[in-house]
Every structure is written in structure tokens, then in C-alpha cells.
Amino acid sequence: LVNFWKEKTVLNKTINQANEKKLEIRKMIQQNKHSTSISSIVEKMIPKLLLVIAIISVVTTAGILITLLSETVAFFREVSFVEFFTGTVLKPLGQNAQFGVLPLLTGTLLSSAIAMLVAIPIGLMTAVYLSEYASDKVRRVLKPILEILAGIPTIVYGFFALTFVTPILRSIIPGLEPTNILSPGIVMGIMIIPMVASLSEDALGAVPNAMREGALALGATKLEVTWKVVVPAAISGIIASFVLGISRAIGETMIVTIASGSSKNFTFDLTQSMQTMTAYIVEVTGGDAPAGSTLYYSLYAVAMTLFVFTLVMNLIAQYVSRKFREEY
């Protein structure tokens, strides 16, 4: 009988322990269900949140485009489309105002061309060196320098062009005006070097090492591997970096506003003062153009032209990147 009660006591303890385990398991299941429900809610909410953010971006772009279009249409009610895009005289003030955009287009394209003549060779050579030749120690030094160049405010570049580069160029080039298109073009090129170098280096770094090793195994030199294997394989990304650099140069504002002057000359003489589209926008917005006037609407017409230019450049970059992309 005593043994029976002992066994019964042990059995009861075992049953109690089992019941406690069941309760713990139930609590864990309930907690898991609760956490699972929270995670499922989060999983459902995140895509919706991302969709809202994407819609905000699209709506913002659409709002900018609608604003530009509406005011540009109002401008072309007063100034003919042909006069605007073929006129070589821009005199927005006075009774006989003329609104030819060619002086601004010339200044913009010349400054951008000068900038890319500086940025493309230096940026590409820098990218090739960092990707193919530089040691880790050298890369750790050059990378921060490029990042510093990319982070300098453009107004600082503008004063650098006006107070440092222009005096040097005037001592070399006779007849160079105090404000000209050459000096800001050169400084814009210096500003764009980090963009071209960084994007081109990324494109070169994406080329598999197997292609380099295969060329070296066939007896090619390091120089031949770089320029006949690696660079052609990365050409889509390199060209895209050039096009994006041009787009950046076209949209630059402060450098040309400070260093190129405000003369609306239709000329191809790099020694003369010229005005770009962005500088004209700054001039008009900083002036006393009354709302509803032709001068006021010309601001939006020029801005719309600038928008189309940069959009075309970005589309070209995307097309080139897709057209010549290599699959590895």
C-alpha cells in the first residue's frame, strides 16, 4: 500500500509537470501567433508605404512638368515659337523686347563642351588608374580627395573660377574678358571629374577578373589588357558616365552665374562674357519681373528648354547603358 501511494505521488507530480509544460507551450504559441500577426501586418504595410513614396516622386515630377508647361504655353502666346528658338538677340527689357534663346543655348553648350573636354580625359584616366593600377594605399588617399571635390559647394567653385582661374588665363590669353565662358567651363570640368571617375571606376570594376586573367594568360601586357579588354567591356557604363556628366554641366548654375557674366552675346568666342540658361533663370528670378509679364513667362520657357535638355541627356545615358551592356 505504501508503495502504491508513493507511485501515485510520483505520477501526480509527473502529470502536474506535464500540465505546466502544456501551459508554457500554449503561451509560446500565443506569443508566436501575436508576433506573426504583427510581422504579417508589417509585411503588408511596407509595400504600400513604398508605393506611396514612389507615387509622391511621380506626382512631384508631374507637378514640376505641369507648372513649366502651363507657364511656357502662356509665353508662346506672346512670343512665337520660331522667334524663340531661332532668334539670336535676347533683350528682355524695354519696349522692343526680343526673346531669342540662341545666346543662352550657345553659352550653355560651350561651357558644357569645355567642361567635358576637361572632365572626360582626366576622369577616365583616374578611373582606369584606380581600378587597374592603384594599390590599396594609394586608393585610400585618392578616394577621399575625389569625395572632397564632389562635396565642395558650387558657389566656392564659382569664386575659384573668378578670382583664381580667370587671372591666370588673362595673363596667358590676350583679350580675355574679366568674365568669360572659358574659365567657368574649365572649373565645371574640375567639378565633374569625381562623377565621371566614380561611375567609370564602377563600370571597370564590374568586369570579371576572369577576362583579365584570360588575356594575361594569352600573353597580353597589362596595358593591352586594360585598353583592349577591360575598357571595351565596360564601355556602356563609361559612356553613360560621360552623358550624365554633360547633363550635370548643362544644369550647373552658380559657377557660370558668378564667373561667366550676364552678357547675352550670341558668339562662339570663348574669351567673351556669355550667359547660360541657368544664369538667366537666376537673373530673372532675382530681378523685378512682374508676374504675368513676358519677361516673367520667359523664365519658364527657358526652364522648360533646360528641362528637356537634361531629360534627353538622361534618356541617352539609359539607352547607351542598355544598348551596350555586357552580360557576364
What is each stretch, according to the model?
Residues 147-192:
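Generic hydrophobic transmembrane alpha-helix motif, especially the helices
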Residues 31-48, 69-115, 135-136, 283-296:
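Periplasmic/extracellular loop-to-transmembrane helix junction in inner-membrane transport proteins
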Residues 201-205, 209, 216, 286, ...:
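C-terminal transmembrane helix and the adjacent membrane-cytosol boundary/short C-terminal tail
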Residues 2-54, 317-328:
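Transmembrane alpha-helical segments of polytopic membrane transport and secretion proteins
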Residues 256-307:
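Interhelical loop and adjacent transmembrane-helix boundary motif
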Residues 199-200, 204, 222-260:
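Transmembrane alpha-helices
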Residues 47, 122-161, 199, 327:
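Cytoplasmic-entry segments and transmembrane alpha-helices of multi-pass inner-membrane transporters
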